Amino acid sequence: RNNLGGQAFWSLGGLFLVDTPEQRRLGIRDSHDLALQDWMGTAGFDRDEDHWPREWAKAYVAFAAGEKRGWLQAMGHRLFPVVGWAERGGYDAMGHGNSVPRFHITWGTGPGVVEPFERRAREHAKTGRITFKFRHRVDALDMTGGAITGVSGKLLESSSESRGESSSRTETGDFAFKAQAV
């Protein structure tokens, strides 16, 4: 209950965005094509089994260059007017890393990233669209016909520890949930 948002809460709040007003204001020239070239150069997809990771990368870069910023803004997310250069790469966009700054820092850092999502999730919980299952440790994913159709694991005893404090790992039972898709 006290840790909704997980590790994102503790983060600096940096988000990968492409060709934004913040970048343009700082004179950073970016584009979908450049970001995709950087991503593909870093990932080094070169095997048959890289097909779906490659497709995911293409979709994510398209999202980051398109609707991601507006979608986040519509939920109340705000950015600092600076852009950092995490995972800095070469300037030629041919190797590992970002060839231009793309690390947009959230106003409020990690808690600022979590807040709009937490608010939205809690609203859905009030209407029954989401059911939170705190203190459930997932140990296995169940597959049927190549799709994940369930999760199972251990129930942990209740804990009222504050965020960042160690909580009990004492197991009190088992659980399993099934669905058409998880």
Residue ranges and their predicted role:
Residues 8-9, 18, 22-29, 86, ...:
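General "foldedness" signal
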Residues 13, 178-182:
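Conserved acidic residues
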Residues 12-61, 75, 80-81:
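Glycine-rich active-site loop/strand segments that organize a redox cofactor
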Residues 10-12, 17, 21, 112, ...:
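A broad "ordered helical/assembly scaffold" signature
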Residues 57-165, 169-175, 179:
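Conserved redox-cofactor binding core of oxidoreductases
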Residues 1-12:
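Glycine-rich FAD pyrophosphate-binding loop
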Residues 2, 15, 22-23, 139, ...:
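Short, glycine-/Ser/Thr-/acidic-enriched flexible segments
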